[in-house]
């Protein structure tokens, strides 16, 4: 059964780029999939830091950042789409999962089945600036997206490996080690892969 014909849902999974994936935006990338359905997929690259720190980002949007533990953390390159827009991947706040009109913590939050949330509204940055807000965050500029059937085609062409997401890779593993750490979830190391390898 091919990926194109199988009904799969890879929400809350990692996509791990195979060595043969030559697109510069995705080479050696680990993508956390926030959403995957028959309409397409949306994810954030979690292992490609930019030169911008969170303190620099907060300065740019005229907010102070009281949490010193976050100030030196990098902003990540989340993907090639809307690279001027920020995306905050974080642990859900206690009242998320309700719509904004029902009192959700932030104006624009997607609660991801599996234990994370992604917020695109500035209010999450405002909460972080005061020392409130989510405890653990990863902030990207831009995101990655695939149209309906596009990701399935790339999987069938062996462009990606997939594995259920492990939050420790996102929040507890240094960025340069995330690719190898994600592979280790499959029991693999980089030297075991070849550009023409199949699916794990």
Swiss-Prot record:
Organism annotation: Verminephrobacter eiseniae (strain EF01-2)
Entry coiled-coil feature ranges: none
GO CC list: cytosol
Protein name per its UniProtKB record: UPF0301 protein Veis_1517
Entry's family note: Belongs to the UPF0301 (AlgH) family.
One Pfam short name: DUF179
Superkingdom, natural source: Bacteria
Cystine pairs: none
């Amino acid at each position: 059964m091919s990926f194109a014909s199988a009904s799969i849902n890879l929400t809350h999974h990692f996509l791990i780029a195979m060595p043969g994936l030559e697109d510069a935006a995705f080479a050696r990338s680990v993508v956390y999939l926030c959403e995957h359905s028959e309409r397409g997929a949306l994810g954030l690259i979690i292992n490609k830091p930019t030169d911008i720190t969170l303190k620099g980002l907060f300065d740019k949007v005229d907010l102070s950042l009281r949490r010193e533990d976050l100030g030196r953390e990098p902003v990540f390159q989340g993907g090639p789409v809307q690279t001027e827009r920020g995306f905050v991947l974080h642990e859900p706040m206690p009242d998320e999962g309700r719509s904004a009109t029902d009192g959700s913590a932030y104006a624009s939050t997607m609660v991801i089945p599996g234990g994370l949330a992604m917020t695109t509204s500035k209010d999450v940055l405002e909460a972080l600036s005061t020392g409130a807000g989510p405890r653990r965050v990863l902030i990207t500029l831009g995101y990655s997206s695939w149209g309906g059937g596009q990701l399935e085609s790339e999987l069938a062409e062996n462009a990606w490996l997939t594995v259920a997401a492990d939050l420790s890779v996102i929040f507890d593993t240094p960025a340069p080690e995330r690719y190898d750490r994600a592979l280790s979830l499959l029991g693999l190391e980089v030297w075991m892969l070849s550009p023409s390898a199949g699916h794990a």
